Swiss-Prot record:
Superkingdom assignment: Eukaryota
Pfam entry (one): GatC
Localisation: Mitochondrion
Protein name, per record: Glutamyl-tRNA(Gln) amidotransferase subunit C, mitochondrial
Functional note: Allows the formation of correctly charged Gln-tRNA(Gln) through the transamidation of misacylated Glu-tRNA(Gln) in the mitochondria. The reaction takes place in the presence of glutamine and ATP through an activated gamma-phospho-Glu-tRNA(Gln).
Gene Ontology CC annotation, any one: glutamyl-tRNA(Gln) amidotransferase complex
Summary of subunit composition and partner proteins: Subunit of the heterotrimeric GatCAB amidotransferase (AdT) complex, composed of A (QRSL1), B (GATB) and C (GATC) subunits.
Gene: Gatc
Species whose genome carries this gene: Rattus norvegicus
GO molecular function: ATP binding; glutaminyl-tRNA synthase (glutamine-hydrolyzing) activity
């Protein structure tokens, strides 16, 4: 009982975060969002092709190279599959804050444990510098090296 009351109290601040699909007021009434606030479509209405500008933009954001026609075709198929969600009738469906909102989830107790196990934990890492984990570089765009001759630095 108290968990349900606590969940209701925490719902109100979360309503501010919804902006694309619907607007939920403090009483839970769903209103359609303004079409101007909808996310832009990758594929224009009535076509099944992704424009070159969108492909270039996605390449910069995701650091993925769509140089082959096969990659662009796969992207277009993925967008067409995702566009099927627009056909789903969601009238009368209450928006979810979490898929687990019908369950009472309990937190574990916060117990202080003995420390001093840094050496043991650092043994799990491939690369350590001054008692810190070193992560590999993420998606860093590298210059295109095709056709370039490496310059010699020793003269």
């Amino acid at each position: 009982m108290w968990a349900q009351a606590a969940r209701v109290q925490f719902r109100a601040p979360l309503d501010r975060g919804r902006s694309f699909a619907s607007k939920v007021g403090p009483r839970g009434k769903v209103q359609a969002a303004d079409p101007k606030t909808q996310a832009p479509r990758l594929v224009p209405e009535g076509t099944d092709r992704v424009s070159a500008a969108v492909v270039e933009h996605l390449e910069r954001l995701a650091l993925v190279n769509f140089s082959s026609r096969e990659a662009v075709d796969r992207l277009e198929k993925a967008v067409a599959f995702a566009d099927q969600l627009h056909a789903v009738d969601t009238d009368g469906v209450e928006p979810l804050e979490s898929v687990l909102e019908d369950r009472c989830l309990y937190l574990r107790s916060d117990k202080v444990a003995e420390g001093g196990c840094a050496e043991e934990l650092l043994q799990n890492s491939n690369h350590v510098v001054e008692e810190y984990f070193v992560a590999p570089p993420g998606n860093i765009p590298l210059p295109d090296m095709v056709g370039k001759v490496p310059s010699s630095t020793a003269e």
